[in-house]
Amino acid sequence: MLSEIIRIADPPLHKHLKFLNAQECMFAFRPVVVLMSRELADAEIGLLWDMLIAGGDHEPTSRANGTLAGGGARLFLHVVAAALVSMRSQVMACKKNDDLMQLVARKLPARKFTAHELVRKAMDLMKTTKGLGEAIEVASRASIALEGL
């Protein structure tokens, strides 16, 4: 979903990620797994997580058969995308995938993001990508239905 957010929000950036063979956004694995805790100052981490919880990212979604499928995490993925888009010029300067991996590993944590800044930018991105989450949810339900056949 991160790749789709970037594709809609910043097509030239997405095109460059494809050039780097990074369109699947594996470079964002660590920020996603650690919930941006290395990218923010300690005082900002709790604030970001509070905003994510207040935004409903923790609420479980369900599959067609009624079993839980995990949280939606839509706002959080838009937060990660906002951080990346904020570093657009540095990402565009990368000549290969390894450069991008190093940029995210070293420079992203050095950025002085604030939780408010990232959430504000993420909410703007959510307006731009309106309907993306619902489309992915419908595709997921269709995929689950096909598995049952």
PLM ranges: what are they?
Residues 1-149:
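Helix-rich, well-folded core regions that mediate interactions or catalysis
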